[in-house]
Amino acid sequence: KEILEKYHDLFTLQWQGVAGNEHVPSQAEWEQLLTNCSGFLFYGMERFMSHLVLNRMVAMNIPKCHLMILLDLVRSKESYQRIMNSDIQKSYLHIAIERPTETAMLLSLTGVGSVIANQWYTTLQENAERLEILSKNLMTTGRTTGRAVRILQK
């Protein structure tokens, strides 16, 4: 929340979404947020795609979304238990589509212009640092997404 508030005025007055522990978004809320955004930020636990209904996601059209930042792949005891319970009901192929590369490809096919995503599991603190670096470089200094990611890699 601190990072969003810090860069709120520099980017847009129309930030929309769910922050903190407000509630768990419904599938309809996810779809509404995704289809009406020009940029999308996910900062959360486990795999981003595990929070969505895959069959509905593959049918979506998201051409307005120019940039999607997925700071996911964070694991806690509770999130691991939730994901394990959820994965029991899924096929191997369904779980495979939720991996980072496959998620980026799927989002690209739905119309998302650029995807910045983690490739490996990480911590909330490391994702907070990534978000700070990306926000500073994209919103304050106006760097391109490619340059901001390159700075992030260093």
Residue ranges and their predicted role:
Residues S38-Y43, L67-L71, V115-I116:
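Structural motif
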Residues S26, H51-A59, T101-A104:
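Alpha-helical scaffolding within the catalytic cores
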Residues F48-N55, S79-N85:
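Glycine/threonine-rich flexible loop motifs
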Residues L67, R75-K154:
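Active-site-proximal C-terminal subdomain of hydrolase catalytic domains
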Residues A19, H23, M45-S50, V74-E78, ...:
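Short acidic, S/G/P-rich loop/turn micro-motifs used as interaction or catalytic elements
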Residues K1-R47:
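A domain-level signal for caspase-like cysteine endopeptidase catalytic cores
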Residues E22-P25, M49, I95-P100:
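Short, glycine/acidic-rich beta->alpha junctions
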Residues M57-K64, T110:
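Short, conserved loop/helix-junction motifs that constitute active-site signature segments
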